[in-house]
């Protein structure tokens, strides 16, 4: 693929997985709205990067802030500064934001609010760790976690949304979140890149990462465990999740070797 296409795909896939399920679709739409050329012009200024990231997410309009926080958001200054910067940059590059109504907040832990995840992604981009080359250079799980590790800008250490203050917290990605990002982002990218380029070392590395990481702990994996299956690592859990979604849920028992053997009894 052309380099620009590779970058766009890498950022799209990474962004989608920053939604951790609930906001996955919204983050993908956001990534598709992200003008990489425009951001590249200002990548040495973290404030401007965050302004474009937040603005393209549709989060810099006053009506996106809960009414009880609007006055404080205007008074603390950061929201207004970001918004003014985005208005300038959006005019300069003819930017159009996504529909903010795509974001979901209900039953979402504050740590997973779009503002927090977008600030973390802005930090990654600013620190030159959002591209494909950095992921390809990570030869171990430890190195991959170092590439993915990020925190928020200073304002978000004491906020979860504009105008709503909280106890100071640097809001690093948790070990659990890092594992999920490696499983759902790094591994597929390594495997696809290896297949496309005919370089098996990347495919092998993807499998090595899955074998090293702990199995996911979700309702699908627990269901299989209750059936007596041993799930030793992330490779096992990914296989069982795929089995459930592509065969069980679609009633494809006759195409499934396990289902076929079960039905023969």
Show the residue positions of the predicted features.
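Charged/polar positions within long, soluble alpha-helices
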Residues: 191, 195, 258-261
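Single conserved hydrophobic/aromatic residue that forms the stacking wall/gate
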Residues: 1-11
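Acidic, carboxylate-rich catalytic segments that either coordinate divalent cations
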Residues: 226-265
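Residue-level detector of well-ordered alpha-helical segments, enriched
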Residues: 6, 182-185, 252
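Conserved phosphate-interacting/catalytic interface
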Residues: 17-193, 201-227, 231, 235
